Amino acid sequence: MSNLSLFDDVSAEIAQLREQIRYHNYRYYALDEPQIPDAEYDRLMQRLRELEAQYPASVTPDSPTQRVGAAPLSAFQTVEHQIPMLSLDNAFEEADVIAFNQRILDRLKSTENIEYACELKLDGLAVSLLYRDGVLVRGATRGDGSKGEDITQNLRTIASVPLKLLGEGYPAVLEVRGEVYMPKAGFNALNEKARSTGEKLFVNPRNAAAGALRQLDSRITASRPLEMCAYSVGLVEGGELPGTHTGILAALKSWGFLTNKETATASTIADCIAFYQSIQARRDSLAYDIDGIVFKVNARELQESLGFISRAPRWAIAYKFPAQEEMTVLQDVEFQVGRTGAVTPVARLQPVFVGGVTVSNATLHNRDEIQRLGIMIGDTVIVRRAGDVIPQIVQVVESRRPTDARPVLFPDHCPVCGSPVETLEDEAIARCSGGLVCAAQRKEAIKHFASRKALDVEGLGDKLVEQLVDTGLVSKLADIYQLTGEQLAAMERMGEKSADNLLQALEASKHTTLAKFIYALGIREIGEATARNLANHFGSLEKLAEADEETLVQVNDVGPVGAHFVAEFFAQESNRQAVADLRAAGIHWQDLDVSTIEDLPLKGLTYVLTGTLEVMSRDDAKAHLLALGAKVAGSVSAKTDYVVAGPGAGSKLQKARELNLNVMDEEALLDLLRKHGRLE
């Protein structure tokens, strides 16, 4: 037999082994119906390893043998989610779920029952898996929803993550979203092993899963008992998906993904609540941790009609399980001062294990909450992890109150700077009146200014900000741009290299956008989306600073409260000086050429971008359209006016044609932008 014939035979055997192993992985992980014993599976895998060792050129990234982990990385790379990974609104009571259903009916102008998909909310970490032509090319964390970290090597080690999709009919580009978690049995075994070797135990399965996913050495991840359960899709191009959420889950299962077997449909909101109650009753007997049930409108057409708010879809809600509660003793109450001067009482507790973690602090919110609880230092209290995340005191056990219990005295003066504490007539929150004179407010203002969604100064972390303010090197925002390498290198846990990297990050942050700068200023009630609306409306900081409240409320998403705080911010000379100092330090952006909102040429028009744009990025195209007054939506509906379709446009383009909508290519978009002065 010739060498060529031998190689052909080996290649055929390797291909057959890979297909067999993928098939049996699918039977085992997705269907939970193995067809062969573990020993036979091990023999198939061993034979494949032997052949690949003899013929290294035959090894491909999607081979089942490549799950073992690769060489350690020095750091994770940042990746941008083309379609944001939004969070979900939460419901904590049955009334919240009923209200959610009513909002949907009202928005759809319908009295008919809505069909919902009911899914278990796995307690793990959300991830994104990107497939091109059926092959896994990238895996990422959710991150802040817009940007995450590239953890492809780690995700490849998880057996329930398909490296190559099964079957046919999947889109050319498919982004699958799911939850990586650690089953209880695997978690217990992991901790038992750690206990036997004297290592530190993991607190709960979620923390163990998070630690495993964020290992720079994927071989460590490969040794951890992780699973990935698919629950939705993101980017889809070059193919069609079923018209319901449950249909999509069925398709994902057929392509090799693990989906949750408990998922069901409910024809009424009462059925949703009954499903929640049935799962809650056997929550502890499940093989994995869950922290609630997610209800999603099942029909994709209705999902698209309902749309999104800036942080979450309108068509889904997470009904959280009641938090676990424990009793402990309130040892003291301290008062913290936040970025906007809010003085918040923080309970210092005798440490107690509740909801899977050891809790020693809890929020008391404000003076009204202290009075409502009737709490005293020394009391025995019931602590709950609200939403299984934020510990809070929900009740005082007065029968256990000691004779030496002391009242909680709310301060009249700021515990940090000594300025008077004020409470507005219509607010429950007490605030330090010191403004940026207060070191605590300065610290929080700088942290916000440097945060990822603001000016994104990488390396300027919370602890370093604390040091810089405490040592007097930074007394106002602009001071961070006057820091020297020598000053930074002298800080704790800093060296010359870290100092140089931070100086470069500070320099890079000087080139920003008007929207990010407005957000970075930390004006009360002005979040990321509202800052963008203000930038698009006024075009320049000067025009924004001159606007009165009556003008400001005309801006989309700006109400009377937000308008008041914006006007108040720019009316204060100290804030105007802070802005001037920042601009003098070199912070700059390109002003937007906009006039009044009535004159914006695309006002009232809705655009959808799909496919790949070649001359500019989709983000740039979106920014130009927004600046001209258009609304840019993420999905096609009958309300869409124009669809901009680049190469690779898929289901959105097809739907646009079905609805007989106006479709334009990138060149037509560029002509439109030139016509209105956005491009030369």
Swiss-Prot record:
It comes from Cellvibrio japonicus (strain Ueda107) (Pseudomonas fluorescens subsp. cellulosa). Keywords: DNA damage, DNA repair, DNA replication, Ligase, Magnesium, Manganese, Metal-binding, NAD, Zinc. It is an enzyme of class 6 (ligase). Belongs to the NAD-dependent DNA ligase family. LigA subfamily. Its cofactor is Mg(2+); Mn(2+). This is DNA ligase. NAD(+) binds at D38, A39, E40, Y41, D42, S87, L88, E119, R142, E179, K296, K320. HAMAP family: DNA_ligase_A. The active site is at K121. InterPro entries: BRCT_dom (IPR001357), BRCT_dom_sf (IPR036420), DisA/LigA_HHH (IPR041663), DNA_ligase (IPR001679), DNA_ligase_AS (IPR018239), DNA_ligase_CS (IPR033136), DNAligase_adenylation (IPR013839), DNAligase_N (IPR013840). Zn(2+) binds at C414, C417, C432, C438. Residues 597-680 form the BRCT domain. One of its GO terms (cellular component) is cytosol. One of its GO terms (biological process) is DNA replication. DNA ligase that catalyzes the formation of phosphodiester linkages between 5'-phosphoryl and 3'-hydroxyl groups in double-stranded DNA using NAD as a coenzyme and as the energy source for the reaction. It is essential for DNA replication and repair of damaged DNA. Its EC number is 6.5.1.2. It catalyses: NAD(+) + (deoxyribonucleotide)n-3'-hydroxyl + 5'-phospho-(deoxyribonucleotide)m = (deoxyribonucleotide)n+m + AMP + beta-nicotinamide D-nucleotide. Signal peptide: none annotated. It comes from the Bacteria.
